[in-house]
């Protein structure tokens, strides 16, 4: 069941792994169940039948219908899109860096995005839209700078990319701390709230751009998925097999950075999902390939589960989703280290 099978349709041939396909179906089912639970969770609790009727516009309670369609559904869809983007981006970063702990932090995107947001908040007292745009621009510039600094001659190796990313991230982290202590209390609190990441007050204006961004980037990632697997054999072996190593690596880095930018613009920086999603997906599928699709589904499931847990634990005030994912991520890392007997 773990082997590779071929599905032939005339002149077309599609390779697939039965276990990976089954895992994706299971993850999709779990995600739908969590989404349904979230649509019924809140100050106005709703049953599955009421949620379904409200989604179809046939609810008997107009207030419940408005809450489901205008408040809860955009939040749930944003969580799905953000989780999927981070999960697939994490799978790409882990493959490129040859590091199971790889994430967007590897090339400093998250720290760079935080720097852009903090500068806008502390120095310019900007609102949410300007803050998100500044975070996007700063994150992309940071990622580009790391890639350029990591180039040695015509190539940017995976380990060199990691080391340069760690150095740039550490420098920006110090700058962020300096900016936070120089701002007034209100600005610092707002900056910290943005840095925590949140799904609160998400609307359709957050859903549509994220959906369009993923619609453009996911096909590119899946198209280069096979080449990404070949890159894991090493640059020399991949080049001998006809893969344009540096071009494919740069293209995949840009795709992964774009996905992370989409997620950051929609919900702010969210920890843990890009790290754990691909790892858990690989354990579930037991596949040697890069878990792009299963990693995306696992990321969506993890973020939905974290949001549901946060709402169940705090009915009075919704906890920032970044806080919940950070807590889960800490326990996951401890479990991972204990399991591998590294401590």
Model-derived features with residue positions:
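Alpha-helical transmembrane segments in inner-membrane proteins
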Residues: 1-343
């Amino acid at each position: 069941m773990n082997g590779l099978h071929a599905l032939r349709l005339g002149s077309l041939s599609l390779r697939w792994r039965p276990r990976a396909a089954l895992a994706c179906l299971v993850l999709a089912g779990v995600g739908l169940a969590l989404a349904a639970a979230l649509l019924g969770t809140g100050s106005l609790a709703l049953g599955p039948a009421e949620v379904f009727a409200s989604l179809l516009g046939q609810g008997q309670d107009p207030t419940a219908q408005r809450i489901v369609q205008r408040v809860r559904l955009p939040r749930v869809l944003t969580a799905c899109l953000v989780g999927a983007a981070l999960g697939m981006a994490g799978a790409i970063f882990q493959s490129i860096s040859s590091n199971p702990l790889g994430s967007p932090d590897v090339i400093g995107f998250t720290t760079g995005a935080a720097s852009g947001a903090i500068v806008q908040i502390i120095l310019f007292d900007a609102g949410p839209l300007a803050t998100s745009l500044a975070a996007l621009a700063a994150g992309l510039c940071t990622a580009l700078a790391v890639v350029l600094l990591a180039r040695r001659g015509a190539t940017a190796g995976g380990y060199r990319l990691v080391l340069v990313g760690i150095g740039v991230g550490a420098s920006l982290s110090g700058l962020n701390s300096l900016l936070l202590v120089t701002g007034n209390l209100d600005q610092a609190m707002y900056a910290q709230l943005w840095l925590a990441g949140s799904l609160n007050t998400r609307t359709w204006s957050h859903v549509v751009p994220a959906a369009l961004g993923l619609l453009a980037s996911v096909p590119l990632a899946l198209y280069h998925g096979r080449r990404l697997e070949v890159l894991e054999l090493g640059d020399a072996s991949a080049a001998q097999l006809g893969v344009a190593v540096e071009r494919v690596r740069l293209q995949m880095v840009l795709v992964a950075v774009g996905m992370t930018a989409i997620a950051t613009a929609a919900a702010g920086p969210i920890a843990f999902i890009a790290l754990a999603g691909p790892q858990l997906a690989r354990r579930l599928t037991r596949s040697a390939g890069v878990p792009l699709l299963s990693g995306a589904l696992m990321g969506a499931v993890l973020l939905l589960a974290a949001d549901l847990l946060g709402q169940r634990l705090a009915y009075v005030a919704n906890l920032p989703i970044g806080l919940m994912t950070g807590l889960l991520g800490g326990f996951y890392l401890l479990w991972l280290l204990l399991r591998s007997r590294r401590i």
